[in-house]
A protein has these predicted regions:
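Extracellular mucin-like PTS domains
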Residues: 13-29
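Anion (oxyanion) recognition and catalysis
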Residues: 57, 156, 205
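Conserved SGNH/GDSL esterase-like catalytic core that processes O-acyl groups on lipids
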Residues: 31-40, 44-138
Length: 215
């Protein structure tokens, strides 16, 4: 299959921002504006963002900008073999930070929500190396911790609170109709999500503008 098609799907450019209803009487106060939430991550984040968009429309309490991109992990560069397909870091992912900076400038989020992790717990070749590595190995752990800190600082640069969710346990099911290699899948190996979550919490210890929410 054309591996570039794995990242062909991304979120809409349109934010879901409920309108504020004016007070109906002289004694009523104007309700606070919706909290602006920008969702960042891969297909997992894309799905979470779609759910938040529905809730935004129903509740009027939040505005949502869904920037999830299928196939884009949080860590930059190198190669990975998620869903058992070896591939370079996709072109769409290489443009991610530039796109996010532009979207932050327009949307002005109060909260940036990052969720996902599958592409970061699978096996990876880091830039400039020829060896597969993964969470639990010191070199990769140091790389991932630095990437968490980088994204937290970058996405919090406009004053937003940066909220990360922990990674769930991933157990991909093979579907020959989709762009997947056959199992077994490296990201499904025991302990990987748990190690990811340990690194995430450690990375954010000195970042007062950040939070970790357990899924």
């Amino acid at each position: 299959p054309d591996l570039n098609q794995i990242v062909a799907l991304s979120a809409s450019d349109d934010a879901v921002i409920p309108t504020t209803v004016a007070p109906s009487g002289p004694d009523e106060t104007l309700p606070p504006p919706p909290v602006r939430v920008m969702v960042v991550g891969d297909s997992f984040a894309l799905s979470v963002g779609l759910g938040l968009e529905h809730w935004a429309n129903e509740s009027g309490q939040i505005g949502v900008l869904n920037t999830g991109i299928v196939g884009c992990g949080f860590g930059r560069g190198g190669m990975n073999r998620g869903i058992n397909l070896e591939r370079e870091w996709p072109d769409a992912c290489k443009e991610r930070d530039q796109i996010l900076a532009q979207k932050m400038g327009v949307f002005q989020p109060d909260i940036v929500l990052l969720t996902g992790g599958m592409w970061d717990i699978t096996d990876r070749k880091l830039d400039g190396t020829d060896t597969w590595t993964h969470v639990g190995e010191p070199v990769y752990d140091a790389y991932l911790e630095a990437e968490f800190r980088y994204l937290t600082d970058f996405l919090g640069s406009t004053g937003a609170t940066v909220v990360w969710t922990t990674a769930p346990t991933f157990s991909p099911e093979y579907n020959p109709q989709t762009f997947m290699g056959k199992p077994p899948y490296y990201e499904a190996r025991p302990g990987r999500s748990e190690r990811y979550n340990e690194i995430l919490r450690r990375a954010l210890e000195a970042r007062p503008n950040s939070r970790v929410v357990a899924l």
